[in-house]
Amino acid sequence: MSTYLDLRGKSIDLSVLAPEDLLLFQQLQADVVRLDSAAYRNHWVTQVSNLLSRRGLSKAAIVGSSLYRLAQDLGSRQQVQRGEARVPDYRDELEGIVLGQFKTRRAFCEATGLSEDMLSHVLARRKHLAIDTLTEALGRVGYRLTITPLSK
């Protein structure tokens, strides 16, 4: 089984790709080197959407596909390499939990026991949470801390 590790350390199984999906992915790997970020994004979205919509996939299915995730990750890596973006870290995932699961930051803080001031500093990238503090806070809202391999 051949896998691709994305910037967030999540594996994408390449063996599930149809041959034409794999061919497009290989082409996109070459395209990302020669195109600027905006041109690459326009290119990959068009290419992936055209290929998968010909199979009758809905937009939601296209966006949820492995090929879409692969093409998107190539663009993210390109932006990081060129200094246009940064590598995501735990604070991005923490912010996703706050925004996606709670009505307000205050509600998140009440549920986790973190202070609003500390959360504000952490999400603004001025401070870090200690691992034991983060682990305990996440556990209170049904999450756990995991360690993932670095992407190459």
Predicted region positions:
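Hydrophobic beta-strand residues in large extracellular and virion-surface proteins
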Residues: L94, V98, F108, L119, ...
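DNA major-groove recognition helix of helix-turn-helix/homeodomain DNA-binding modules
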Residues: I131-T148
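Recognition helices and adjacent regulatory flanks at domain boundaries
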Residues: R82, Q101, I147-L150
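Residue-level detection of the helix-turn-helix DNA-binding "recognition helix"
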Residues: A124-R125
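Short alpha-helical DNA-recognition segment
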Residues: F102-H121
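Short, amphipathic alpha-helical "recognition" segments used to contact nucleic acids or chromatin
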Residues: V87-Q101
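N-terminal flexible/basic segments that precede or flank functional cores
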Residues: M1-Y90
